[in-house]
């Protein structure tokens, strides 16, 4: 059995040795394979790094070339170059293509507009040449043209009048509606005023009640403050008396202790050890024991009194109780200061309430008469504003009519003076593109001054005067405003028609007198209103 077991063990060891050898060979092969893989990876890494470096150089070169091409494409346009410096070549190419396409479209549009304007200019030039080639118009045509211009001016003026009248009518309707709404809102305002008066009366009664309550509260606070102050003073005095008594007792105890210690020390020093007998020692011991007992009983009595006064059960609580009493005393002093400040504030509040009570007491209560007077004043003011509005409307219509008549007269004068040519020496006023009233007036002024100078230079004759009068009468014969006035009784017109029954009726007051009378009337009304309020 032993041999068999030894052989088995040897076989197992042989197998294990072979296994370990195989494992070592496998490990060596694995290490060799790993080294080969590492060498291959290093070679690939070097190749990849060189490729990356080459790619980076190519990319930098391509980027530089793109920037060069972009700057060359943008030219001297610095904003465009800065806008596209960070973009890629494809994006810049697309943007530049779009920009060039837009510019080409704009160029084509401008060329088209230039061609159209050239065609229009040619047509207008042809029309101008045709108009220049036409013969001069006859007098009848000029007269018809003048009539047409007058009719156009009249139509424009009537249209302006119609528009202004419509605007005035709309403004009148708006003002009427606004005044109606305002008038409808007056009863609500009066109700609000009545409610305010009622609220003021209720607030006045509440303020009176509040002032009475505040006065009662202040009296109660004053009474409580006096009581608390008196009780606090009594407590403070009692506490001080107790503390003084306790301090005196403690001082007595300390003095007794010190004197007893001193006496004992002296006795120990003076005592002769050789001569002292046992009897004297016993007697002295008895005396000292009785004295100590009396002293201890006195001290315990004093301590008990202090405990009962301070209300504590232990001796070591006495100091803390004294400190607590000191803190309470300080707190009470602070509370007294706060109460004093509160008392001052309450006094100020009472004074303010008394003043408000006096103001409200002597204030007049509102009545229905004041409301009626306010309503009457408001209606009078409304009527005055309506009258002012009507007056402003009438003045505005008069002003518009006057302006229209002036414009019509200036237009007619301008049309009539257009045919008069000024001499070469006198400079003609250059008219603006928009013929406004001022330019027309300046034009007419130049022509009229020239005509006035010519009239002064020409000598007047009766034949010329009659011709002018006849032409004026014939030209204004069919006008509406040209009415005949009959002067039948010329002598009666010279008679004074101001027949007054009395000289007082013929008196017309001056402006200062009217102002004085108005001031007197206003002062009288104000005095009457003040008397009613009182």
Swiss-Prot record:
Coiled coil: 10-54, 136-209, 323-396
Keywords, comma-separated and alphabetical: Coiled coil
Protein name, per record: Coiled-coil domain-containing protein 183
Source species: Homo sapiens (Human)
């Amino acid at each position: 059995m032993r041999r068999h077991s030894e052989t088995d063990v040897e076989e197992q060891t042989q197998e294990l040795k072979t296994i370990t050898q195989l494992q070592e060979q496998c490990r060596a092969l694995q290490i060799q394979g790993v080294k080969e893989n590492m060498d291959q990876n290093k070679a690939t890494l070097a190749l990849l790094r060189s490729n990356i470096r080459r790619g980076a150089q190519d990319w930098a070169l391509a980027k530089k070339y793109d920037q060069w091409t972009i700057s060359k494409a943008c030219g001297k346009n610095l904003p465009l170059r800065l806008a596209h410096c960070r973009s890629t070549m494809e994006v810049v190419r697309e943007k530049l293509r779009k920009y060039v396409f837009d510019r080409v479209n704009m160029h084509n549009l401008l060329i088209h507009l230039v061609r159209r304007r050239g065609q229009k200019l040619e047509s207008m030039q042809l029309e101008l040449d045709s108009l220049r080639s036409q013969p001069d118009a006859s007098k009848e045509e000029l007269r018809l043209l003048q009539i047409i211009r007058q009719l156009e001016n009249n139509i424009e003026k009537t249209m302006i009048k119609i528009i202004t009248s419509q605007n005035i009518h709309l403004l009148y309707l708006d003002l009427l509606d606004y005044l109606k709404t305002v008038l409808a809102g007056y009863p609500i305002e009066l109700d609000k005023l009545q409610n305010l008066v009622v609220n003021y009366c209720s607030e006045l009664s509440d303020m009176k009640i509040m002032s009475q309550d505040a006065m009662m509260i202040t009296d109660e606070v004053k009474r409580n403050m006096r009581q608390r102050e008196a009780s606090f003073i009594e407590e403070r005095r009692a506490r001080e008396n107790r503390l003084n008594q306790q301090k005196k007792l403690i001082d007595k105890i300390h003095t007794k202790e010190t004197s007893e210690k001193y006496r004992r020390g002296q006795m120990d020093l003076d005592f002769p050890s050789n001569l002292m007998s046992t009897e004297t020692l016993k007697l002295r011991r008895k005396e000292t024991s009785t004295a100590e007992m009396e002293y201890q009983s006195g001290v315990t009595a004093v301590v008990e009194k202090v405990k009962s006064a301070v209300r504590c059960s232990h001796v070591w609580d006495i100091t803390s109780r004294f400190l607590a009493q000191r803190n309470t005393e300080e707190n009470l002093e602070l509370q007294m200061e706060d109460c004093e400040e509160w008392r001052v504030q309450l006094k100020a509040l009472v004074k303010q309430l008394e003043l408000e009570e006096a103001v409200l007491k002597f204030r007049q209560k509102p009545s229905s008469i004041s409301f009626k007077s306010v309503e009457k004043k408001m209606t009078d003011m409304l009527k005055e504003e309506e009258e002012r509005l009507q007056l402003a409307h009438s003045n505005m219509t008069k002003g518009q009519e006057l302006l229209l008549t002036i414009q019509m007269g200036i237009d007619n004068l301008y049309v009539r003076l257009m045919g008069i040519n000024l001499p070469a020496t006198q400079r003609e006023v250059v008219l603006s593109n928009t013929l406004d009233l001022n330019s027309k007036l300046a034009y007419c002024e130049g022509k009229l001054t020239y005509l006035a100078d010519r009239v002064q230079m020409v000598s007047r004759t009766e034949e010329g005067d009659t011709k002018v009068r006849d032409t004026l009468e014939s030209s204004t014969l069919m006008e509406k405003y040209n009415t005949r006035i009959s002067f039948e009784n010329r002598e009666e017109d010279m008679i004074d028609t101001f027949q007054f029954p009395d000289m007082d009726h013929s008196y017309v007051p001056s402006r200062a007198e009217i102002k004085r009378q108005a001031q007197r009337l206003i002062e009288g009304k104000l005095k009457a209103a003040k008397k009613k309020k009182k």
